[in-house]
């Protein structure tokens, strides 16, 4: 008979894709932390831009594989709009983190602010919590206490980032008021770093909404 012995095509695993994206979020965040802590000059930082972009390109590849799988897939583990939202939201974390790295180079920073080191650690912590949560997310229809606590942790880290950002910006305007260019540049840099943590929280909130939905 025709078709006998023909191997059935393996079904695409969307949860594996989410985990891969979350792992790349951690990888990009750790690169940012490394760059911030080892900073010497913007010229030296330029050498790290290809590494950051390679991670971003790898993440784009995961996105494309998800969208390609969705086209012919009639039965998906989550609603299509939820899969698309998760994929795009996770990819946004990586894009934002790469943008922070690029900004340090584009703005030609001459020194690394100590609070940037604190912020980079928060970004790593948020991404790590999200990545750990993503491992359990495939069982989101039977949410575990561990998964819930990890999502709460992401929100707690975002609260820490908000408090740090508030104090940093105030200090900039109080202590650097005679240097408006420095205030402007570092405000934009810290805003971009805070956006990374905010996006981690947005993904965690999306995960929580999906858990409630199912």
Where in the sequence are the language-model features?
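Cytosolic, long alpha-helical scaffolding segments
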Residues: 1-214
């Amino acid at each position: 008979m025709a078709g006998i012995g023909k191997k059935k095509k393996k079904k695409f695993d969307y949860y594996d894709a989410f985990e891969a994206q979350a792992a790349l979020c951690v990888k990009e965040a750790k690169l940012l932390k490394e760059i911030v802590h080892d900073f010497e000059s913007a010229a030296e930082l330029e050498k790290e831009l290809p590494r950051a972009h390679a991670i971003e390109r790898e993440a784009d590849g995961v996105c494309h594989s998800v969208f390609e799988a969705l086209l012919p897939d009639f039965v998906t583990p989550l609603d299509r709009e939820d899969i698309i939202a998760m994929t795009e939201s996770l990819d946004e974390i990586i894009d934002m983190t790469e943008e922070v790295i690029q900004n340090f180079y584009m703005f030609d920073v001459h020194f690394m602010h100590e609070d940037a080191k604190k912020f980079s650690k928060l970004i790593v912590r948020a991404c790590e919590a999200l990545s750990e949560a993503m491992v359990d997310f495939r069982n989101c229809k039977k949410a575990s206490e561990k998964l819930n606590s990890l999502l709460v942790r992401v929100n707690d880290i975002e609260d820490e980032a908000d408090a740090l950002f508030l104090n940093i910006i105030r200090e900039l305007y109080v202590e650097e008021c005679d240097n408006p260019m420095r205030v402007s540049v570092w405000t934009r840099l810290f805003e971009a770093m805070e956006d990374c943590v905010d996006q981690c929280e947005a993904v965690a909130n999306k995960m929580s909404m999906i858990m409630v939905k199912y």
